[in-house]
């Protein structure tokens, strides 16, 4: 009974508890269903929102492309409208002219002109109305390609136009004008622009020099330029001693390959500014500016040319102080007859003139040469001698020789005859007579001062022929463009510098010395050389000189050198060097002068040397030094034979 009651109590207790549990479970299940439904709704709303956002973004992009197309269409319509406006202005101007003329002729023509003007004035409105269509319609790819092609063509036309020219692009004239030189330069200082500006300035300066040289050639004077470079002048202004820089052969050739002056007008510029189309006032202003710039450039060019011409003429007037006869050919000397003005002193290296009479008789096969007189010889103060003698030899055989007696004075008169026998008429044209003037000294050997070669091909067949020969100071007889070959005339005179002195083959140097005891300055002028030859090849050498001042024990006190003279057997230096030497040291110093041949790819080669002063290389050098000390400031010039090393 108790058990039954207990089980019934348990059932009564668990029955409501189980019902409560079931209700709780149902409530939880309903809540889960509601949550799942709400989650599904939220996911649907999110998908709708994302789709809406994507659609909005697409709409925005479509609107942007539409606006861009609209702006591009507006630009095209504006350009076409501007072109139409320009054409309307052009036609309106033309119609206004027609209207003025029509008013003078008849009223009907006047009315017709007004109608045409009004019709033209309505074109921009039509164009603007028509251009509204592309705002709605899409653009065509072919039209875009055509417009891009037109733009590239216009840009290419601008780049290809030359300065100051007019070109037509798509029916419209384009004007390119340039300003002054300052406007051509850009703001960036790059190396390329600097190099371009340098090349332009060099081409202009070279063109100025070429024009000046052409004007100098048109004067009719055949005198050639001389080397007049010097380190210091004879005055007492300079104190420093510096070596001259070597002349560059490439720079010398560059002067003969100059650009003409007309090419400066086609120099490319760094920037150009095309004028606006349809602006007639701007066109006129650009033409005026270009004409003003061209006139200013022309004035500056003419001024610089006048300055260089004046400089060249001044150098020509001063050229009488030097001698360039050794640089001329015999034909040029025969044609040239320059008169030295009175009051100008004779050049130091001038050898004078020799009057000769030729007479050939074919019957006896004899050639008689009469040496009449010599004129214009250097005086004793310059040459150091006052006695003269003429040697004559028949080339190429050198078997027939003759000489005159010694005569004294600056204008010696000889009047002596030299006869060459057994000279057949067929051999006359192949022969030549060489005249050499020697300075005769007592107890010493003769010194050759000048020479001249006369070709018998110029000889008259019968009768006498009077000729005045210009004596060249130690010139190279084989370099005058003669009809005789160098080997036929004298092989020793053209290829060797080691022959005997009787043939005049030894290299010599003309040196000027002066000393000022007050300032203690020893001035040494290396004037010119003679018979400088290149033993390696059969061509004239490239020579330069070196000067050394040595003390009593042979130590070097100072040195300097001249510039290079290229391809000259008889170079003219005319360079002066100043050494500071006290009066009490003058008898203890030695001046050594060496001449070198500069050879490519090889070491330099010494042509010869001389020494003056305490350890003189010979009696002539010692006499020259002593005479310099006695003259007290006056320059003494002497020829010296170079000693081979």
From Swiss-Prot:
The keyword Repeat applies. Pfam families: C2. Residues 350-469, 505-640 form the C2 domain. Residues 102-121, 144-192, 206-344, 478-503 are annotated as: Disordered. Keywords: Repeat. Homodimer. Can also form heterodimers. Belongs to the synaptotagmin family. Expressed in brain. The lineage of its organism: Eukaryota, Metazoa, Chordata, Craniata, Vertebrata. The keyword Nucleus does not apply. It comes from Homo sapiens (Human). Residues 485-502 have a biased composition (Low complexity). PANTHER family: SYNAPTOTAGMIN 14, ISOFORM D, SYNAPTOTAGMIN-16. SUPFAM superfamilies: C2 domain (Calcium/lipid-binding domain, CaLB). GO terms for molecular function: identical protein binding; phospholipid binding. It comes from the Eukaryota. This is Synaptotagmin-16.
């Amino acid at each position: 009974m108790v058990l039954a009651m207990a089980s019934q109590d348990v059932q009564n207790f668990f029955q409501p508890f189980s019902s409560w549990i079931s209700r709780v479970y149902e409530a939880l299940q309903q809540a889960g269903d509601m949550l799942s439904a709400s989650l599904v709704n939220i996911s649907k709303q999110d998908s709708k929102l994302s789709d809406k956002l994507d659609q909005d973004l697409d709409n925005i992009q479509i609107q942007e492309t539409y606006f861009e197309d609209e702006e591009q269409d507006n630009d095209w319509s504006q350009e076409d409208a501007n072109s139409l406006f320009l054409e309307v202005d052009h036609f309106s101007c033309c119609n206004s002219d027609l209207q003025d003329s029509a008013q003078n002729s008849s009223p009907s023509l006047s009315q017709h002109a007004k109608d045409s003007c009004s019709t033209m004035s309505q074109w921009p409105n039509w164009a603007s109305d028509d251009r509204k269509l592309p705002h709605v319609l899409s653009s065509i790819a072919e039209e875009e390609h055509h417009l891009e092609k037109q733009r590239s063509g216009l840009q290419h036309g601008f780049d290809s136009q030359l300065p100051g020219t007019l070109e037509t692009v798509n029916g419209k004239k384009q004007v390119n004008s340039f300003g002054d030189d300052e406007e051509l330069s850009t703001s960036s200082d790059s190396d390329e622009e600097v190099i371009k500006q340098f090349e332009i300035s060099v081409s202009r300066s070279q063109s100025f020099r070429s024009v000046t040289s052409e004007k100098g050639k048109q004067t009719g004077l055949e005198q050639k330029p001389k080397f007049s470079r010097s380190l210091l002048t004879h005055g007492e202004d300079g104190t420093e001693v510096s070596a001259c820089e070597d002349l560059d052969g490439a720079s010398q050739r560059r002067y003969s390959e100059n650009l003409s002056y007309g090419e400066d007008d086609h120099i490319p510029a760094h920037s150009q500014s095309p004028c606006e189309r349809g602006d007639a006032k701007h066109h006129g202003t650009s033409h005026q500016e270009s004409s003003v710039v061209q006139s200013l450039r022309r004035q500056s060019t003419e001024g610089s040319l006048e300055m260089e011409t004046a400089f060249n003429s001044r150098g020509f007037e001063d050229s009488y102080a030097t001698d360039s006869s050794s640089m001329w050919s015999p034909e040029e000397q025969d044609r040239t007859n320059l008169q030295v003005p009175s009051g100008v002193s004779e050049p130091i290296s001038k050898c004078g003139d020799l009057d000769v009479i030729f007479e050939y008789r074919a019957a006896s096969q004899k050639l008689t040469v009469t040496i009449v007189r010599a004129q214009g010889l250097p005086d004793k103060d310059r040459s150091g001698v006052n006695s003269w003698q003429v040697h004559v030899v028949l080339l190429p055989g050198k078997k027939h020789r003759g000489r005159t007696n010694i005569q004294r004075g600056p204008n010696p008169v000889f009047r002596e005859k030299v006869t060459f026998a057994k000279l057949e008429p067929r051999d006359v044209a192949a022969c030549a007579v060489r005249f050499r003037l020697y300075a005769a000294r007592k107890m010493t050997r003769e010194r050759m001062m000048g020479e001249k070669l006369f070709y018998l091909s110029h000889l008259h067949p019968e009768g006498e022929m009077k000729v005045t020969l210009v004596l060249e100071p130690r010139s190279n007889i084989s370099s005058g463009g003669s009809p005789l070959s160098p080997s036929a005339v004298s092989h020793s005179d053209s290829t060797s510098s080691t022959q005997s002195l009787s043939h005049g083959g030894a290299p010599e140097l003309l040196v000027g010395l002066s000393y000022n005891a007050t300032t203690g300055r020893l001035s040494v002028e290396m004037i010119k050389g003679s018979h400088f030859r290149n033993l390696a090849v059969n061509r004239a050498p490239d020579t330069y000189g070196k000067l050394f001042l040595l003390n009593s024990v042979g130590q070097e006190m100072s040195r300097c050198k001249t510039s290079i003279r290229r391809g000259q057997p008889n170079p003219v230096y005319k360079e002066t060097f100043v050494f500071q030497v006290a009066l009490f040291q003058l008898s203890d110093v030695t001046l050594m002068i060496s001449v070198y041949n500069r050879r490519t790819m090889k070491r330099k080669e010494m042509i010869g040397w001389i020494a003056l002063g305490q350890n003189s290389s010979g009696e002539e050098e010692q006499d020259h030094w002593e005479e310099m000390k006695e003259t007290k400031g006056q320059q003494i010039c002497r020829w010296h034979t170079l000693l081979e090393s």
